[in-house]
Amino acid sequence: MDQENFHGSSLPQQLQNLHIQPQQASPNPVQTGFAPRRHYNNLVGLGNGNAVSGSPVKGAPLGQRHVKLKKEKISAQVAQLSQPGQLQLSDVGDPALAGGSGLQGGVGLMGVILPSDEALKFVSETDANGLAMKTPVSILQELLSRRGITPGYELVQIEGAIHEPTFRFRVSFKDKDTPFTAMGAGRSKKEAKHAAARALIDKLIGAQLPESPSSSAGPSVTGLTVAGSGGDGNANATGGGDASDKTVGNPIGWLQEMCMQRRWPPPSYETETEVGLPHERLFTIACSILNYREMGKGKSKKIAKRLAAHRMWMRLQETPIDSGKISDSICGELEGEPRSSENYYGELKDISVPTLTTQHSNKVSQFHKTLKNATGKKLLKLQKTCLKNNKIDYIKLLGEIATENQFEVTYVDIEEKTFSGQFQCLVQLSTLPVGVCHGSGPTAADAQRHAAQNALEYLKIMTKK
């Protein structure tokens, strides 16, 4: 079959204008039971999203099959050609740009119009509409894979109503024995994962990612803690009325939990203003905890309260805890006035303390005399020991002195932590009278060690001659 009659009289002239050599179309045998094979000329095939070749796409030999692309991708690629520095259509048939083969040898449209590296980058980073396909999860995976680290995702909690659940995910990894953890929440598991990954990326690179379409449906509550900092996360919310409807999760419950963990008074809510027409009311509610105060506005009291709690929760996450100020604030909260030594300890005058009897006084005096006259080697060595040296095993030394002087040592861990979040411990010496010393530390073991150190200081003072 003559090529001019098959493709039309204008095809060779069009191919010549594009510097593309015409190809001889080989007829294909008709197969029974299959639709007739379609033949496209190069220009029509290019416009319809088919491979650019004189050979048929479907059923072609393996060496002559071509990549079939969507119209959107072809349009995006053709648009790139019009930019300065890009490959022009007049260069399509250049063998140097097409790998020395022009349109022959089974080279698809992507390989002809774009160099192979640019084609791979285009396909991997864009979709059919030319939009970025990278999500926070994929970006985090790419960042950590360079260091041979794979982040792990864990479903922590599902909260909210059955028809509107809120999923909370934790993403974590270890780098040189340093744990990194981030929390994220969303209306779907996918959204929660992306929120957690976004929070971790924000911390790692110190920059905010652009909002993705999946997270635009509502702000995602995310939080990040590094090496057990104890933070529960942060959230994105605005102070407007409608925007507050998109607040994810239960900020009122989170704030209540935070106050319980820190042993603070519970938050109090108070309606400040109520303005607007009856059908368009705008409420303002204040949330107060100790000396902190945050406001929330919304079209209903519920929305305003949630926003106020959310802002307070966010503020407390970012505010360092000052144990001294917190203690003064709590005392002022409980007593209704700022703490002062006279007011705070004034009630001690009214407390009835049992009177020291002569018999009990003699026992205490006898105990002190016995301690001072003790001749144990460990107890005598204690007088010459500097107890500020951290290399000393205080618990072991106290046990040796107790064995030598025949009294028992009992450690009592206190469940309640200090205002600064430290563990507490009491050590009891079964002497007469009973000696009790207190200790605190970042861990329960450190608290016991500190209590033993204070007990040794007590014995050192009582046995000084």
UniProtKB/Swiss-Prot annotation:
InterPro entries: dsRBD_dom, RLC_Component. Residues 1-337 are annotated as: Necessary for enhancing pre-miRNA processing by Dcr-1. Residues 211-223 have a biased composition (Polar residues). Residues 340-465 are annotated as: Necessary for interaction with Dcr-1. Residues 228-242 have a biased composition (Gly residues). GO terms for biological process: central nervous system development; dosage compensation by hyperactivation of X chromosome; female germ-line stem cell asymmetric division; germ-line stem cell population maintenance; miRNA metabolic process; pre-miRNA processing; regulation of regulatory ncRNA processing; RISC complex assembly. Residues 308-309 are annotated as: Necessary for binding pre-miRNA. Gene3D superfamilies: 3.30.160.20. PANTHER family: LOQUACIOUS, ISOFORM B. Homodimer. This is Protein Loquacious. The gene is loqs.
